[in-house]
Amino acid sequence: MRLFRLELKRILKSRRTLILLAIALLLSVAMAYLPISFEGINRPNEDGTVTELDGLAAIKYKQDLYKTSAGEVTPDRIKSALETYQSCVREYGPVEEEGFPLAVFIEKIVPFRHLLMGLSEAFADPLTGIGADLMDIDPNDIDGAYYEKCAEHLQDVMRNEQRENETAQQKALEKYSELDTPFYLHSGISKDAFDYIELYILFLAILCVAIAAPTFAGEYQTGGDSILRTTKYGHKQLAITKILAAFTLFVVTFLVGITVHILILDAAFGTDCLKTSFQMRYSIINLPNINLGQLQIILAAAGLLSVLATVSCMLFLSAKCKDTLTVLLISIVVLLMPLFAYVAMGAT
């Protein structure tokens, strides 16, 4: 235990380590602020003027608007929202055009638009998968059959993408039937907030790799590796101690950083929106039976495992390579390789 404390103290005495840890915590705050700053909305005033709201002011204003649509996503509510949308479009023209009255948009469209997000997808063309225009959907087709329509769309997608794999098609439908319905919606938090959680985890992994790179390779450069090979408490015991000290530091750093990051986001966007079903924020045919709050936990847990896996790979390289720079470069390539592979596979 004393050896463990001394090793941890040795790591923390490094100015380079302290700077990188400070950067990790600063990034936690800065990257949580970015999706908050991206929020914006125009608020019509009684005198006919328009006020541009950004950041927390925009979030607060949107929260007040979204309260009317919060609750279970029932077919009746979706039908009512669609009828309101179609009525407004017939009277004022397409919502996307500049001529659409801002006051009408804020009062009748914004509060309920997230209820309609999955509707176009659910009524998509069964062959092409192209979403239906909301104006082409008959509100009467939604009565009591909305979730059946979602399941039909999933069946169409699986038939198109897994044509040769009937087992996968059946498994997807079985998994979808296990979802808790009706879905729940409390709009507020944006997709950007979750994207930045993932991006922060990536940066955190890079910083942890930079901190841990000299763990063994640095000893080779200074000649300190002779202690590992010749002393009474060297060999396996000292190596394990160095690894445990590094892991402890990274786990604590990750937990503090990701906790601060998520707390800032939840304080800004509110915790009510975390009850929203995963399907109402992403695709209506997503299979995970979770809400956005659980998604945050899953991202954090998966992120921690990813960081520890990356650091484990880096420690192995640090033990094999003779200089820190080589370890650092190879580790970063390994860390970013899944991103490059994803882009390459997506392109093909």
Language-model features: where?
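Hydrophobic transmembrane alpha-helix segments characteristic of membrane transport
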Residues: 219-226
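Short helix-to-coil transition segments within interhelical loops
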Residues: 229-235
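Aromatic-anchored segments of alpha-helical transmembrane domains
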Residues: 28-32, 333-343
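Central hydrophobic cores of alpha-helical transmembrane segments
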Residues: 24, 325-338
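Aromatic- and glycine-rich beta-strand/loop motifs that create alpha-glucan
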Residues: 1-18
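Secretory targeting signals
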Residues: 25-89, 94, 138-219, 240-323
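Residues that define the loop-to-transmembrane-helix transition and helix capping
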Residues: 15-18, 236, 324-325
